[in-house]
């Protein structure tokens, strides 16, 4: 299964505890995370910790990490310019690009949402307004 994730240190924390020898074990535990509903915690934890699953991090999410780091809302152990690529490499996260076609399609579809991540409130979700997800080997949760 391939899963697209939002800018969430919880995902990296869970995956790194499984795959990295030098794991980041910060306070972002899933049972305390505001975006994880109580009934989704165990399912999300199992999916993320299963190293047979792939985790994708969008360029937009990496940008949000950098913005939140700069604003002091997300204090990672090092500047986001080095933290994000290093964490992606160490935890086996693959990049997911967001290009102009994605943003243009959101506007053309007449969606009232100003976000290109309309389902970001659900853990491990990504949404496309058409069948773009069928072009990638991505299972949607």
From Swiss-Prot:
| Region annotated Disordered, chain positions | 99-141
Task: Report the record's disulfide bonds.
Answer: none
Q: Which cofactor does it need?
A: Mg(2+)
Q: Which family does it belong to?
A: Belongs to the PINc/VapC protein family.
Q: What is this protein called?
A: Ribonuclease VapC16
Which keywords fit this entry according to its UniProt record?
A: Hydrolase, Magnesium, Metal-binding, Nuclease, Toxin-antitoxin system
Q: Give the residues the record marks as binding Mg(2+).
A: 99
The EC number(s) attached to this protein equal: 3.1.-.-
A GO molecular function held by the record = metal ion binding
Domain of life of the organism in this record? Answer: Bacteria
